[in-house]
Amino acid sequence: RNDSLLLDQWYDKMVISEILPVPYIGEPFTGYDQINLSFPELENIILTQKPDWKAALETTQGIYMITDTLNGKRYVGSAYGSNGIWSRWRDYVDSQGHGGNTELSNVIKRTVNYARMNFQFTMLEAINLKVEEDIVIRREQHWKTVLLTQNKEYGYNLN
């Protein structure tokens, strides 16, 4: 009941500036080099199966990075196979942020919504689905080395 009283105080000052033809479900896909998503943004894209994002992420494999915005540590991972980045990032959403990774699992156990509050997802390198898995894994190792994510001071990669 208190909520409606609060709305009553502001109702006459509110302006409807636009009525969208469909409910807002996030930003459109604008390119692999533009991906920089908070966990809630990624979760929204995956759970609503946003068609433009799904089409783009299902048809590419690649190297991605998860940044812990609380402490600056990073995790570099790769996605390869028939459903590409989409499938791998869906694993993170389904697992509340760890994607089956031991170190990330230990991190998110600290706080109930740790990943939701602190994880940021970005693409480092998009790779055609026709490229062989071993090449994707070599590129992942390159990024781990460059970004020092195997050093506990800077990252969450254990291998």
State where each predicted segment sits.
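Mixed-charge (Asp/Glu-Lys/Arg
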Residues: 105-114, 134, 150, 154, ...
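Domain-level recognition of nuclease-like catalytic cores that cleave nucleotide substrates
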Residues: 130-149
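Conserved short loop/helix modules at catalytic or binding sites
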Residues: 82-129
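Generic alpha-helical secondary structure signal
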Residues: 40, 87, 102, 134-137
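Short, hydrophobic/aromatic alpha-helical segments in well-folded domains
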Residues: 62-63, 88, 139
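GIY-YIG nuclease catalytic motif and its immediate N-terminal context
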Residues: 1-80
